Amino acid sequence: MNAYTSDMDFHGGSKLSKITYPLKTIYNSEARKKIRLVLDDFKPDVCHINNFNYQLTPSIILEIQKWRKEGNPCQIVFTAHDYQLVCPNHMCKNPNTGENCEKCLGGHFLNCTKGKCIHGSTAKSFIGTMEANFWKLNGAYKYIDTMICCSEFLKTKMDTNPLFAKKTIAMHNFVDEVEWKDAKKKDYVLYFGRFSKEKGIDTLLKVCKELSDVQFIFAGAGPLENEINGIPNIKNVGFQTGDSLETLIREARFSIYPSEWYENCPFSVMESQMYGTPVLGAKIGGIPELIIEGQTGELFESGNEEELKNKIDKLWSNKSLAEKYSANCKENKFDNVETYVNKLMKIYRGEN
């Protein structure tokens, strides 16, 4: 990123930078000039861009288009990892109310300012509104040839913009292949991920307290860590990676993904099944696309405490069912890097 634009400190910085940053997050002339140097030097057939808002800004798209018009054929491909192009706070969730929100969909970006949706700040939210409206009116996004969405759910939200609907395709992220092992399951249910409200931790903790006979292991970190500690049937092992995390996943009866926001393509849901552990996932965002309900796991209504409790009890009490789901995980195939690259190459060649 710093190869194309100066480092931007959004939380500190000088008095001058606090004045210039808001403008630079909307249109970055420095990034535009530097991307031109790369284009002239490298002469790409494809420019594949990812998270460009606020630092590189869509100004780079204008420069790529200008370069194309000068006789340089080049596809512009964009991978959407979040809702940034249709929601200025990129999550479709109001951080003040905690509610999922679609008010900005369709280009109604003033709702971001009304809801103080960026860091709870009217000023920052207004800048986000300005940025979204500027590029809506400028029309830079029309120069993107293909928009890759990492879930069907994300695609439906992007498609609320008629311009995007002509360009979007859904393609889940890839995962590294792992060796299948018939691990010996142990008597615990696993949650691994961030300990935060949008991840559904509040709801899960209430259920854990009611299911005192079920042993839970939580692996992760986050702002709600203190609320986890002290619940007798929860063992908090902290943030885990590598072999230790793999072992925790493989040996769990099942894992839980109780998210309460519009997750796109959560790696944890795929990772759990890759290691032979079924998933009890919230029916929200792209999560249902990754679980074969009734085969590699179960789904429950996001935020529904009673349904989550019943589903946990069902899978905990019926050990043979959980074992059946575990065996089925072997058949739930996700794209590996080779498959993903082959799909990308078809897009690059314009065969999608």
Segments the model singles out, each with a brief description of its role:
Residues 234, 294-301, 314-315:
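A short acidic/histidine/glycine-rich donor-binding loop in glycosyltransferase catalytic cores
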Residues 226-247:
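Nucleotide-activated donor-binding/catalytic signature segment of Leloir-type glycosyltransferases, i.e.
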Residues 227, 270, 284-294, 298-299:
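Short acidic/histidine- and often glycine-rich active-site loop of Leloir-type glycosyltransferases
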Residues 250-264, 277:
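Acidic donor-binding loop of glycosyltransferase active sites
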Residues 85, 102-180:
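Donor nucleotide-sugar binding/catalytic pocket of nucleotide-sugar-dependent glycosyltransferases
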Residues 260, 277, 281-288, 302-303:
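Short glycine-rich donor-binding/catalytic loop of glycosyltransferases
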Residues 296, 307, 314, 321-335, ...:
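A short, well-ordered alpha-helix in the C-terminal region of glycosyltransferases
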Residues 148, 175, 181-199, 205-209, ...:
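Conserved donor-binding/catalytic core segment of Leloir-type glycosyltransferases
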